[in-house]
Amino acid sequence: MPLQDFLFTSESVTEGHPDKMADQISDAVLDAVLRQDPKGRVACETLLKTGYVMIAGEITTKARIDYPKLARETVRRIGYTSGDMGFDANTCAVLVAVDQQSPDIGQGVDTGGAGDQGMMFGYACDETPELMPAPIQYAHAVTKQLAKARRAGLDLLRPDGKSQVSVEYRDGRPARIDTVVVSTQHAESVSNKRLHEAVREQVIAKALPKRLVDRKTRILINPTGRFVIGGPMGDTGVTGRKIIVDTYGGMGRHGGGAFSGKDPSKVDRSAAYMGRYIAKNVVAAGLAARCEVQVAYAIGVAEPVSVMVDTFGTAKVPEGKIARAVREVFGLTPRAIIEGLDLLRPVYEKTAAYGHFGRTEKTFTWERTDKKDALADAAGLSKIRAVAGV
């Protein structure tokens, strides 16, 4: 029997977190390739440490890419423009080690097959307007507000930061926020009192729903007391190390493959986006309150080897009907996914911070709910509603 009363916690990190810096540089490279060569193949990894960026991977393209310029522009946009912050876009070294994609992989992908084997998951639920789990959505809201406040002139803040939100569920529904943790890099001269006041008033109060925050909600700001050394000086940053932040905050399962730096022929990315698209449309159609979709592929093979739909006991029609409707309504070959979601556009750098899902920007095509009516019809829900007079 599923849990009904519990606490669930998810975390988010800012764009200035070193792992997210790596993700954004990798996706900036991908976008640069797609602008010039939509058929380019990209598998780009980034590593950052004090004073330098390393870009490595396998990239096959006709595009001409200035990697050092691209890396520095990305770091500058994030906000690391002074040695006082521990990293400087203007002076950092950029090392590049890029080869072409193996022709052994290319021969399967070029004919429409999957770029690798693996399983991917998509998830949606009716806890928030974005059909995302509440804990991760609120954690992202806090980190986005941290960055917004910093850019709006709260200059005591620095780019690196994290949030963690614990939501109390009653009868299986979000009832209140139990604990909020914010750790933010800051100027050395700022007092703890001033920092705490600023984060409470200009970040937490603006980011979280007032109806869910009460007198018992615990607010923990920089619990260690000091966070001056941050960014790549404090921690090495590597592409693909924040895969739970990127997805559902642990509420939905994850197949293990990271997203950033990968062109959409890699089903790690494109099929996970399709999984979200399917799950969100299932929930939006009213077929279930929660939905998780798993798809799995073999390298070089176009059709998925399996498709699974789990609604956790919330389905309005038998799950078998939903699964059959999914196969009927959605094309699940890599080519169909790429075409259906228009994935050969340079839109990926925006995905690399604050989550790939639950976003409202129009470029996030996998967040549309334009298939909900077709799904409801295919699964027989429309007939049930008609009989019931709904």
UniProtKB/Swiss-Prot annotation:
Stated name of the protein: S-adenosylmethionine synthase
One Gene Ontology cellular component: cytoplasm
Free-text comment on the cofactor: Binds 2 divalent ions per subunit.
Gene: metK
Organism per entry: Anaeromyxobacter dehalogenans (strain 2CP-C)
Pathway membership: Amino-acid biosynthesis; S-adenosyl-L-methionine biosynthesis; S-adenosyl-L-methionine from L-methionine: step 1/1
Residues annotated to bind K(+): E45
Enzyme class: transferase
Binding site for Mg(2+): D19
Catalyzed reactions: L-methionine + ATP + H2O = S-adenosyl-L-methionine + phosphate + diphosphate
